[in-house]
A protein has these predicted regions:
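N-terminal nucleophile
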Residues: 1-293
């Protein structure tokens, strides 16, 4: 299978005195064709973290599934008694052990080589009471998966923490800088939903064949809960999409619904007496992140 690229982001969002960790991705897979319904953000058995990927899906999906199961099989990690840094270590051990089990290689190939996939892993680190983001990647110099902590931006932007992996990351970063500058936010402290807006616009302008489909979104809150979101696509009047897939005619996703052109707002179905009740309640994130009560 040819390498499958994407654009996947994770950043710490700051609104007033509140922070939350946001993951966003496109939904396209390419392998001689385009398929725009592929999950790229994954919840885990522990509720304080998310993981996303960019790269070859023949590696990515087995690695994520087995890593998730390994966390679920380990009560101290599943119950969050161990910090997410321990979960990150579990992920790397699983990735490397699985890669070592690749065999029956093509003639003349001695090792499995570069898997062509990268991951963003992040969540709330309760021991240090802060959000953390790591990039998990293959390092050819040691022939293993390893990690890199995502560091804050420099130049008066120390509160801005952002991970980008996949296709056209340089362009995405340039667009983000220009967007922040146009709003008078450079230098500044923290992101709102600007990285999502950049992803949305790059999907819409169709300038990159590897980036497409409805945006995906997930969040981790400081009370150690993760939440996936549905996104109305291609705009607020469109069908809700969850992890890239459009809701079927009979479906009503039990997820907050995001307007891609007002991503600081989201709606959810109100508590209803029956499944036929389609009333929505709109909530704006002000000083507190969205909480499903």
């Amino acid at each position: 299978m040819e390498a499958t690229i994407t654009l996947s982001l994770a950043w710490i969002r700051s609104v007033g005195n509140t922070q939350e960790l946001v993951f966003a991705s496109d939904s396209r897979l390419r392998a001689g064709q385009a398929w725009d319904v592929a999950p790229k953000i994954f919840t885990l058995p522990r509720s304080d973290a998310l993981i996303s990927f960019a790269g070859a899906t023949d590696y990515a999906y087995p690695l994520v599934v087995q890593m998730s199961q390994a966390i679920g099989f380990f009560p101290a990690s599943r119950d969050r008694r161990n910090d997410i840094s321990v979960a990150k270590g579990i992920a790397l051990k699983v990735f490397n052990e699985m890669r070592e089990n690749i065999h029956d290689l093509p003639r003349g190939q001695m090792t499995a080589g570069d898997p062509g996939v990268r991951f963003i892993f992040g969540g709330y680190q309760w021991r240090q009471k802060r959000f953390r983001i790591w990039e998990l990647h293959y390092d050819a110099s040691i022939d293993r998966f390893t990690f890199r902590p995502v560091q804050p931006w420099h130049g008066g932007n120390s509160g801005r923490v952002l991970a980008m992996i996949g296709d056209a990351t340089d362009e995405a970063r340039d667009r983000l800088v220009e967007l922040l500058r146009s709003r008078g936010k450079l230098p500044g402290n923290g992101f709102d939903m600007e990285p999502f807006e950049v992803l949305r616009d790059m999907i819409r302008d169709r300038s990159h064949p590897a980036i497409g489909g409805a945006p995906q979104l997930g969040k981790v809150y400081s009370y150690m809960r993760s939440q996936l979101f549905a996104v109305a696509w291609p705009d607020a009047t469109g069908v809700p999409h969850a992890l890239g897939r459009a809701a079927l005619g009979f479906e009503r996703f039990d997820l907050p619904l995001l307007d891609p052109d007002a991503p600081h707002l989201h709606s959810r179905h109100a508590a209803a007496a029956s499944d036929d009740d389609e009333e929505f309640v709109t909530t704006e994130l002000a000083d507190e992140p969205y909480e499903d009560d």
